[in-house]
Each structure stands twice: as structure tokens, then as C-alpha cells.
């Protein structure tokens, strides 16, 4: 009954939001003059869905409930990240602007997908490089960088890019941490990301994801994975200012040492 009620509520809200797409063009212009916007920002403002504070509250509450009922609802998890993460995204923006590498990312706005990355080149790199490690991670876990949801609800295009960057770098973080995509490792990675980025969505996924672990997994999680994730999340360098695409040929062990990543014992 609760599932049916949620689906009905979501359909109504989605229709209401979709009807507002035409409104986006008529809202007041962004603080940055249109001619000064880059390609990502222009494209984002065309597809952004404008929402009121009340709709944002409803989306945040509804998506959190839906994510708890079904952790595989990636659309709801993405929605939760956008409606609850604005403050953390501003902090991430500050951390990226504070480093030369982070500023280059904000200027270039690179994207990570099969159209922008030459994966055959990565596969041909020596096996001890970060690029080869990432390519092997994707192949071993049968995942693709093209599966990430587009950002829709954030008002500021700068924050929209940072959220996009976070999503597209998630698998890179998995590879750097040497964590596959099973439930236990996914929860551990979410703890690392939560402590490293401050995104509320990551905290929620880490806490409630752990609840769904099987008894044997939970014992292993509490004994090894959680302490490891907390130590790394607190001790690592900020990950969002890392220009991963310019580190494909870097030795993976040297990269982990540079970032402060400690291996799982």
C-alpha cells in the first residue's frame, strides 16, 4: 500500500515538475551574462528543471523514502543528492578553487564517458598504472561510465557541474580504493565519500546501506571495512580537486600514497 501511494505521489510530482520545463526559459537570467557561460553551463540551463523551495522539500523527503524502500532506485538516490547537497557542494567548490589542479577542472569541465575517454588506450597502458587499473575495474565489475544520471534540479550551473563530476568520478574512486561493486564494498566507499565530500546523500547511503548487509557481511563490515573507511575518509586528500584524467599513466601505488589511501588489511 505504501509503495503504491509513493508511486502515485511521485507520478503527480513528476508531472508537475515536467510542466515547469517551459518556465525555465522565462526565469530571471543567471548572475553570469549568457555570453560568459561555457558550453556545459549553457546546456545545463536549457535542461534544468526549476523547482520551488516547497517542491525541493517534497522531492528530498520523497526520494529519501524511495531510496530506503529500494536502494536500486538510482534515480531517487540522484534526486536526493541534488535536493540535500547544496551546502556541501559549495564547500567542494571552495576546495577545488583552492588548488591549481582543482581550478583546471573547473575551467576545463571534463566529462567521463565512453565518448570522451579512449578506453582502448587505457587498457593498453602498463598494468600498474591508474588508467589500466580503472579500465580493469570497469571490465571486472561489468559497469560503464555512461550509466550516470544527469543533474536536473540544482539552480547554480557551477554546482550542477560539481555534482556531475562527483557522479562521474565515483567509479574512479572505487578503482583508486581497490574496492569492487558488491554491497559491502559499496557501503565502505560511501563512507569514504561522505567523510571526504560532506555530501548528505553519501552519509545516508552509508548508514542505511549497512542496515541491509547480511549478518556475515555485517560482522566483516564492523571489524574491517568501517574502521578502514573512516580512517581513509578522514585522512585522505580531498578527492574532488583531483584531475583523474591527467593521471592515467601515474603508478597506482604512487597515486594511492600521494592521496593518503591506506590499503584494506
From Swiss-Prot:
Q: Which UniProt keywords apply?
A: Lyase, Membrane, Metal-binding, Mitochondrion, Mitochondrion inner membrane, Transit peptide, Ubiquinone biosynthesis, Zinc
**Listed cofactors:** Zn(2+)
Reactions catalysed according to its record: a 4-hydroxy-3-methoxy-5-(all-trans-polyprenyl)benzoate + H(+) = a 2-methoxy-6-(all-trans-polyprenyl)phenol + CO2
Q: In which pathway does it act?
A: Cofactor biosynthesis; ubiquinone biosynthesis
Transit peptide, UniProt annotation: 1-30
Q: Please report the record's description of how this protein sits within the membrane.
A: Peripheral membrane protein
Compartment(s) of residence: Mitochondrion inner membrane
Binding of Zn(2+), residues: 170-171, 174, 186
Q: What are the EC numbers?
A: 4.1.1.130
**Enzyme class, spelled out:** lyase
GO cellular component annotations, sorted alphabetically?
Answer: extrinsic component of mitochondrial inner membrane
Function recorded in the entry: Lyase that catalyzes the C1-decarboxylation of 4-hydroxy-3-methoxy-5-(all-trans-polyprenyl)benzoic acid into 2-methoxy-6-(all-trans-polyprenyl)phenol during ubiquinone biosynthesis.
Note the subunit structure. Component of a multi-subunit COQ enzyme complex.
Q: Which family does it belong to?
A: Belongs to the COQ4 family.
Specify the protein name: Ubiquinone biosynthesis protein COQ4 homolog, mitochondrial
Query: Can you name the source organism?
Result: Drosophila virilis (Fruit fly)
Amino acid at each position: 500500500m505504501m509503495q503504491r501511494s509513493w508511486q502515485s505521489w511521485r507520478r503527480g510530482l513528476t508531472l508537475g515538475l515536467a510542466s515547469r520545463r517551459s518556465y525555465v526559459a522565462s526565469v530571471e537570467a543567471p548572475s553570469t551574462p549568457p555570453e560568459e557561460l561555457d558550453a556545459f553551463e549553457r546546456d545545463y540551463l536549457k535542461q534544468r528543471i526549476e523547482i520551488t523551495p516547497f517542491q525541493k522539500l517534497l522531492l528530498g523527503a520523497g526520494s529519501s523514502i524511495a531510496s530506503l524502500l529500494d536502494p536500486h532506485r538510482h534515480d531517487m538516490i540522484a534526486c536526493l543528492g541534488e535536493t540535500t547537497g547544496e551546502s556541501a557542494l559549495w564547500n567542494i567548490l571552495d576546495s577545488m578553487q583552492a588548488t591549481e589542479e582543482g581550478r583546471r577542472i573547473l575551467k576545463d569541465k571534463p566529462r567521463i564517458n565512453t565518448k570522451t575517454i579512449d578506453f582502448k588506450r587505457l587498457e593498453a597502458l602498463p598494468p600498474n598504472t591508474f588508467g589500466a587499473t580503472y579500465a580493469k575495474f570497469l571490465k571486472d565489475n561489468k559497469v560503464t561510465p555512461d550509466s550516470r544520471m544527469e543533474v536536473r534540479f540544482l539552480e547554480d550551473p557551477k554546482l550542477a557541474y560539481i555534482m556531475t563530476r562527483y557522479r562521474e568520478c565515483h567509479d574512479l574512486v572505487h578503482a583508486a580504493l581497490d574496492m569492487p561493486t558488491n554491497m559491502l564494498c559499496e557501503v565502505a566507499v560511501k563512507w569514504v565519500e561522505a567523510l571526504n565530500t560532506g555530501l548528505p546523500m553519501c552519509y545516508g547511503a552509508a548508514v542505511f546501506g549497512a542496515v541491509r548487509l547480511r549478518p556475515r557481511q555485517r560482522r566483516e563490515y564492523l571489524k574491517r571495512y568501517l574502521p578502514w573507511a573512516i580512517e581513509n575518509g578522514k585522512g585522505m586528500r580531498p578527492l574532488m580537486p583531483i584531475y583523474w584524467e591527467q593521471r592515467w599513466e601515474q603508478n597506482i601505488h604512487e597515486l594511492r600514497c600521494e592521496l593518503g589511501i591506506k590499503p584494506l588489511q
